Design a protein with these regions (language model features):
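Beta-sandwich interaction modules
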Residues: 61-90, 97-101
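Short beta-strand/loop motifs in extracellular/secreted proteins, especially
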Residues: 28-30, 40-44, 110-112
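Short acidic, gly/pro-rich beta-turn/loop elements at beta-sheet edges
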Residues: 42, 56, 102-104, 124-126, ...
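Hydrophobic beta-strand segments within beta-rich accessory/binding domains
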Residues: 19-38, 81, 90-95, 102-103
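Solvent-exposed, flexible loop/coil segments flanking beta-strands in beta-rich domains
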Residues: 1-35, 116-120, 128, 145-151
Length: 196
């Protein structure tokens, strides 16, 4: 399977653009490679939906030009929900941050595309083994009732950070390690337009 979907960043292009592609049966991975130059990546937020309309990947295009959804967290790009790749019509939804388009493009149109294949490969920015949400995007890996520390005192932490899910420089695992090394009591990644 191989499909190419075309999109455009411009002052006249729709802020929300969609494209669909057909996934065959017995597909194990979906690999989506985009052609947009890195300098324009942060202008675009992408969501990939399966045939049931469930979001299976959400990410701001800001780092590696390859997105992948697989059956495990090791073959799924950060921002993706690993699991079974169902047969049927899938959708890529591209949303542009319109308030920055004209200023950064000088008014010219910037075409870009996604090449979608069922030939997966290793993933540089993978989700990992700690999967927080299931295929229906229901959070199952976070216990809201668990108390990590009690007592009145000053707590040291950060409520506003970004990772490579949006426009940050770190993967979540690296950012978490840094927080531990700094002795933070809490660390909260607050991505642009992304829930994770």
């Amino acid at each position: 399977m191989m499909t190419v979907l075309e999109f455009e960043i411009s002052g006249t292009a729709a802020c929300r653009q969609t494209g669909t592609f057909q996934v065959p049966s017995a597909c194990k991975q979906l690999r989506m490679t985009y052609t947009l130059d890195k300098q324009y990546g942060f202008l675009v937020f992408v969501a990939v939906k399966d045939p049931k309309g469930q979001i299976r990947l959400q990410k701001q295009l800001s780092s590696t030009p390859v997105l992948q959804i697989g059956e495990t967290g090791r073959d799924t790009t950060l921002g993706g929900i690993p699991g079974r790749i169902c047969e049927g019509k899938w959708q890529i939804e591209v949303c542009l941050f319109a308030e920055h388009v004209h200023r950064l493009t000088g008014g010219k149109g910037i075409p870009f595309s996604f090449e979608i294949t069922d030939q997966g490969d290793t993933v540089e920015e993978y989700v990992g083994d700690n999967i927080w949400a299931d295929e229906q995007f229901v959070y199952s890996g976070f216990d809201q009732k668990k108390v990590y520390r009690e007592g009145a005192r000053w707590y040291k932490g950060d409520f506003h950070t970004h990772t490579r899910l949006s426009d940050g420089k770190e993967l979540p695992t690296g950012a978490s390690r840094k927080a531990e090394l700094m002795g933070l009591d809490y660390y909260m990644a607050t991505e642009h337009n992304v829930v994770h």
